[in-house]
């Protein structure tokens, strides 16, 4: 049975086309991975099917009474609500059913026999619904999911308005899973999860009876939970049976076959054109030349999709710094309350360090405290001599109406326009990306704009906050290569062991500071 039908979907931003005449059908119980390079339109597709974005053309049709759950990381949580009260809202419909049962029992005292029978029948249906959803052990279900995703660690009575962005996303994910909708729409759900929580979510999705569509650049995770791949590429959406690795094999084979057919056809076209040119003027061979020309005219020419630009990262190194990069003495970090005990640490020239640990416990706050962006609650940070810092923030500020071109040009006004364009192109951005407003670019494309800034300023220390969060596989591999070759020091927050292993010299486990 079809849950969702998408017909002839076409959409773009200005002159930049995202989809062209795309159709899609989701069946009950399908576990779909939605994949594609940065900027191909995966998140845009999610926004369209959930009604948050109106397509230029096409039809979106959900089946009746289907319950859709979407992990929207921009959902606003009301100040004053606790973590527990937000999670309880996953069962609002069940609490409504319970209230209706109580209302019916109160009305039975004044009911006649027919009314009583009707009320008892309705109560029976409602009670069956409550029982089938384990209504009377909801608190235990809430606690189980909260522990499994690390939400309980924030404190179930904590005010959600005081949580970090990553913590709020975890709460929203927990609420979504508790709702158990007919279709789950998940956009990079592992970005804010630690290894043990990713493992739990993996098992949950493997056993999930209903359908889901998953966007993720975490390939091992994707491989373990999906049975279908939909690939977004060159404004098309194509279906492949199997997991991501199986898709890669079939896709590579199809691409190779198409290239071979293209090369054969190009040779045939060249031979036909050569024959026509040599023989069209001679009376004896004119008819044969005309016949070859007709064949050329009727030929359906094979076209190869243009190769997507791949980033080529290269970070410039400045002068050598002093021995120490940072020294922290009795450092206590936080905002209204301390997030750590007294921290004493130092970073020396040449070190490449990954800061790891649970999400939302203060890793970004530590970076900002070391950089002087946030004032510590106690202690001091001493920065070494001759330090030239490059800082990569986790997200681009919202509402940036500048184009990517303007963003870089404003930072480096001495560069010419061709130089700015070339710099952005080296980061894997096309002309249409370069001329688009930063706010309409995908998360991965926005990250590439921020990397472009880092690449065009000399540094001897790079401070990177979750640099891989929105990058596709090719961009991650290229970034790792560039950071391995970087001659300076690196301090980064990262939750992907497969990225920082083989790159860093030291690992700081933040849980030892908390």
Predicted regions and their residues:
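Post-kinase regulatory C-tail/linker adjacent to protein kinase catalytic domains
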Residues: 313-315
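Intracellular alpha-helical coupling/juxtamembrane segments of multi-pass membrane proteins
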Residues: 250-305
